[in-house]
């Protein structure tokens, strides 16, 4: 029978203690959960947006499989995607995050542009010739006669409480003009 002795005490120097970074189990779990959510965001992307992101072949296959899976199989596949992301380098994960943020931000920029177009249309319809002149200075390629006719028709429709056909046409014209630049 072997005798049990004391565990040998390690002689740590201050330099060695400073190099060791202790990570709690909870922090590891939080990081794993965060990567799993990142994987879920990848699964939710459309195929066109997914093609814009450079992913490892195994990760791309796992994401495509998760998109086809349902219920429990999808949950397991998301766990697997999280595992693949945990084994990825920090640069790869940062690239994925930046790409996802860029895609989400692009959507927000488009929404802001559409709101700006609506506001511009309202200013043109409510405003006077000064607003039109300011618009023409900013967008010299605009068809002046066509836009004036649309604004005049929109004002007339509003006075007569008719359907806002010209109002919608102004918006479409502005959208085509500004977004084509």
From Swiss-Prot:
GO terms for cellular component: cytosol. One of its GO terms (biological process) is assembly of large subunit precursor of preribosome. InterPro entries: DarP (IPR006839), DarP_sf (IPR023153). GO terms for molecular function: ribosome binding; rRNA binding. Keywords: Cytoplasm, Ribosome biogenesis, RNA-binding, rRNA-binding. Its main location: cytoplasm. It comes from the Bacteria. CDD domains: YjgA-like. Gene3D superfamilies: PSPTO4464-like domains. It is found in: Cytoplasm. Member of a network of 50S ribosomal subunit biogenesis factors which assembles along the 30S-50S interface, preventing incorrect 23S rRNA structures from forming. Promotes peptidyl transferase center (PTC) maturation. Belongs to the DarP family. This is Dual-action ribosomal maturation protein DarP. It comes from Actinobacillus succinogenes (strain ATCC 55618 / DSM 22257 / CCUG 43843 / 130Z).
């Amino acid at each position: 029978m072997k005798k049990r002795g004391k565990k040998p005490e390690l002689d740590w120097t201050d330099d060695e203690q400073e190099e060791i970074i202790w990570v709690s189990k909870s922090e590891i779990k939080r990081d794993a959960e965060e990567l799993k959510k990142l994987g879920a965001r990848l699964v939710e992307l459309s195929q066109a947006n997914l093609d814009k992101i450079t992913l490892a072949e195994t990760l791309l296959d796992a994401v495509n499989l998760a998109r086809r899976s349902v219920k429990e199989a999808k949950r397991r596949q998301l766990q697997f995607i999280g595992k693949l992301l945990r084994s990825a380098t920090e640069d790869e994960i940062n690239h994925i995050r930046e790409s996802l943020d860029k895609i989400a931000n692009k959507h927000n920029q488009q929404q802001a542009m559409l709101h700006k177009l609506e506001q511009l249309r309202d200013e043109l319809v409510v405003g006077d010739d000064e607003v039109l002149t300011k618009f023409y200075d900013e967008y010299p390629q605009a068809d002046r006669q066509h836009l004036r006719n649309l604004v005049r028709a929109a004002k007339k429709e509003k006075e007569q409480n008719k359907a806002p056909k010209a109002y919608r046409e102004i918006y479409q014209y502005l959208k085509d003009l500004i977004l084509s630049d």
